[in-house]
Amino acid sequence: MRKSLKQKIVSSLLAVSLAVSLAPIGQAKADSTSEVTQTPSITKQIDPNRAIEHVRFLSETIGPRPGGTKSEEWASRYIGMQLKSMGYEVEYQPFQVPDQYVGFIESPLSTKRNWQAGAAPNALISTEAVTAPLIFVQGGTKLEDIPNEVNGKIVLFERGTTVTDYNKQVENAVSKGAKGVLLYSLIGGRGNYGQTFNPRLMKKQSIPVFGLAYAQGNAFKEEIAKKGTTILSLKARHESKLTSLNVIAKKKPKKSTGNEKAVVVSSHYDSVVGAPGANDNASGTGLVLELARAFQNVETDKEIRFITFGSEETGLLGSDYYVNSLSQKERDRILGVFNADMVATNYDKAKNLYAMTPDGSTNFVTDAALQAGKQLNNDLVLQGKFGSSDHVPFAEAGIPAALFIWMGVDSWNPLIYHIEKVYHTPQDNVLENISPERMRMALDVIGTGVYNSLQKPVPQTEQKAA
């Protein structure tokens, strides 16, 4: 870890630790079943305000956390130091991840849109700024769409609908003397607003070409409409030979033999380029850290692990690496994995907290979640079928696991679902996308499910497998 990064972590931790220590303790919810009434409910120890302070630090103080970058490393060290301060044994598990091509835009506009974008790998990648006025051009797939005024300017386009279309936009702008090209997405792949992307160019270009999110492009378009133009500076960086980290905290039973069953609470802490990732997935990481604090003094006869994975957004790389590092004996020790991803959105159509498995089957974790919902008199907890998160590698290895996510589902076949429109965008921030009430509910449900799992006897089938 570089010295400058370490200084940032230490100074920032002092500030956030003070804020967290002053947060009030949340009120407990009454148990509605008799299964655990003999012991205090873990919800008495849970405070969503603490979790949201972690969300705020990760998404605002650090910001976008693409896999393998310095910002992701900063986040991993922050998480590790928080867990160590609670008394946990902490391991950093490194693994290699693909290169990142990141564009940076200096703009007179507010920084709330996170002026970070995807850079085209085979366009100009340079830390020396390309500075020029910005001009918006409608269309651009035909040469006649491009006015002569683009000469010496940075051109903003609404991204063409296909790779071929946006390559034509770039090539036509270059032929008219453009100094840079910004392509902004209109829509994402899941009904969300357009997100940043790395343009795939068919020809090498000697100017910077960036892929912007809808919010960024629209903000620039509005600025041009108001003022006629604005001056931008473009820089880009190719980050190679990258290492990402899984942060693993363990709490062994008081009488440990090394063969006890284990319950895992997990999340990923990285985000996509250009997105502060408050809900996706600083929310899950804030939940993991708050549950780690709540469970630090809970005695059980099972091991509990709190794991935050790196580089989920680049293909579940962290969780896949972790699962592959386990022997079959170690895999058999895991009773279940409670994976939190996008657990605090305020989006009204994401109306249920789901416990999802990749194939839709029930397992130890979904059963625990549904039981917790009943115990808490919460009828918003449902079970369903969904992949696309860190529960998948565990499930593929035969380990019971479930994804916890706020979502609205209109139909399972065909699958028609709702997640927040600001998913994977610069608008995924605390102010615009985080609900303390939703965070509270996720903490209560997952916390209660984990608590019950740690207290109850190991199922007979699991005892035989051990």
What are these regions (language model features)?
Residues 20-35:
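Sec-dependent signal peptide cleavage junction
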Residues 33-71, 86, 93-95, 196, ...:
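N-terminal capping segment at the start of a domain
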Residues 37-47, 60-73, 89, 121-125, ...:
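Second-shell loop/turn segments in exported
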Residues 44-49, 53-154, 161:
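Noncatalytic luminal/extracellular "stalk/propeptide" segments of secretory-pathway proteins
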Residues 83, 173, 187, 247, ...:
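Alpha-helical metal-binding/catalytic segments enriched in His/Glu/Asp
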Residues 117-144, 198-278, 293, 297, ...:
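Soluble metallo-hydrolase cores and metallopeptidase-like ectodomains found primarily
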Residues 300, 309-408, 412-413:
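Metal-dependent peptidase/peptidase-like ectodomains
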Residues 413-466:
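His/Asp/Glu-rich mid-to-C-terminal helical/loop segments that flank catalytic regions of hydrolases
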